[in-house]
């Protein structure tokens, strides 16, 4: 009886590991758009945190360099936050709401 229970538990752990790997693969290709300055600056970021595109509104070309740099940083930070939110939501679905410790990734 113990062997059957342990075997079932191992099977469930493997299934969860497979689902988490699939979710991680999907997250890596996820695209989010971070914005700053009411959409004047947009940063498109992939789920693996690679920046794919930066868009600047034409009206910014007349503004000073410091403001543009601040808006770019804010848009990047917004994109990073959005990736983190999406990752948490998708992984929560896979783990049934069980929160993994920070930095812990599946598969182990």
UniProtKB/Swiss-Prot annotation:
Per the record, which residues fall in region Disordered?
Answer: 1-20, 87-108
GO terms for MF: DNA binding
Major localisation? cytoplasm
Q: Give one Pfam family.
A: YbaB_DNA_bd
Q: Where in the cell is it found?
A: Cytoplasm, Nucleoid
Where on the tree of life does the source sit, at the highest rank?
Bacteria
The record's section on InterPro entries has:
YbaB-like_sf (IPR036894), YbaB/EbfC (IPR004401)
What cellular-component terms does GO give this entry?
A: bacterial nucleoid; cytosol
Q: What are the protein's UniProt keywords?
A: Cytoplasm, DNA-binding
Q: Which family does it belong to?
A: Belongs to the YbaB/EbfC family.
Tell me, what does this protein do in biology?
Binds to DNA and alters its conformation. May be involved in regulation of gene expression, nucleoid organization and DNA protection.
How this chain assembles, per its entry, is: Homodimer.
Q: Which PANTHER family match?
A: NUCLEOID-ASSOCIATED PROTEIN YBAB
Stated name of the protein: Nucleoid-associated protein PSHAa1202
């Amino acid at each position: 009886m113990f062997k059957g229970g342990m075997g079932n538990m191992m099977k469930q752990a493997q299934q969860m590991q497979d689902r988490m790997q699939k979710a991680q693969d999907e997250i890596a290709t996820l695209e989010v758009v971070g914005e700053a300055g009411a959409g004047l600056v947009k940063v498109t970021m992939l789920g693996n945190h690679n920046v794919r595109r930066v868009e600047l509104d034409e009206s910014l070309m007349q503004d000073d360099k410091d403001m543009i740099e601040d808006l770019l940083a804010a848009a990047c930070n917004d994109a990073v936050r959005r990736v983190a939110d999406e990752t948490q939501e998708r992984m929560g679905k896979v783990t049934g709401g069980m929160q993994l410790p920070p930095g812990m990734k599946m598969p182990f």
